């Protein structure tokens, strides 16, 4: 990690991922920020030397308004393909409207999410997606899986206990407020086990009545009793 004179994170360097954060630094097309807001970010991942990134703009209350995508160190190649725009906030600072852009076909890019969000206090109650296009291939987008006034529920600690957009009927928690069981509307279940320090030790997926077990032992991950992978810093 690299830092500037204000101790703000400036860069992350590794064999598989590199990232540079810009604040008041000049990068073509950005608006320098002297208050700690990030004005731009560049990154590259894997063996590729191709850089991608975003320029950011903020409103008068330092709330993000736009994330403007581009490629190369000038962010001038393939511009706007994966832009994001926050269209409105409520008085508490909660996001009310969000536009996301992405790949809509093998050669086209456009709007993939047009989200309207409603709240009870600061707790999200429902999300409606008015976008007409879906993301291409295996890209990520919001999946509008429900059309109800209340699509999310919470317990007294503020933990999420229901998410109808993800088809989750019930989420149960242990005494450490860590999720212990997730029950889906189709009857499938995910169960979690933890150590006394909160570290996750086991995950059990029960899918169509068939159980698969994943155990976490330090940097070793086992699936159904067989070593699956060893985690290490490349």
Which residues are covered by each model-predicted region?
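Buried hydrophobic residues that stabilize the cores of well-folded domains
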Residues: 1-3, 28-29, 84-86, 95-97
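Short, surface-exposed coil-to-beta transition loops
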Residues: 50-52, 82, 112
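Beta-turn initiation residues at beta-strand->coil junctions
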Residues: 1, 5, 11-16, 40-47, ...
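Short secondary-structure transition motifs
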Residues: 5-14, 91-119, 172-234
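Short, ordered secondary-structure scaffold segments
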Residues: 19-52, 58, 118-166, 210-234
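Short glycine-/Asp-/Thr-/Trp-enriched loop segments that recur within the blades
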Residues: 74-82
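Extracellular/surface-associated beta-sandwich interaction domains
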Residues: 66, 81-84, 91, 181
